[in-house]
Amino acid sequence: MANPTCKMSKSRRDKRRAQFNARTKAAVTVNCPHCGEPTLSHRACRHCGHYRGRFVLNKAEK
């Protein structure tokens, strides 16, 4: 059976695994409970600035 000839470092191993995970996992979107706009989960809403029922982003008035 084939054996590795050189030890692979942890950083090199993790870089290889990160490429696989980046391609296979899709972004999870949910609707904001405050305004109803689609947002990424576990992130503040870009449209209204709310996260977990609190106002966290200061949106400048145009």
Swiss-Prot record:
SUPFAM superfamilies: Zn-binding ribosomal proteins. GO terms for molecular function: structural constituent of ribosome. The keyword Ribonucleoprotein applies. The keyword Iron does not apply. It comes from Chlorobium chlorochromatii (strain CaD3). GO terms for cellular component: large ribosomal subunit. Transmembrane segments: none annotated. Keywords: Ribonucleoprotein, Ribosomal protein. GO terms for biological process: translation. Belongs to the bacterial ribosomal protein bL32 family. This is Large ribosomal subunit protein bL32. Pfam families: Ribosomal_L32p (PF01783).
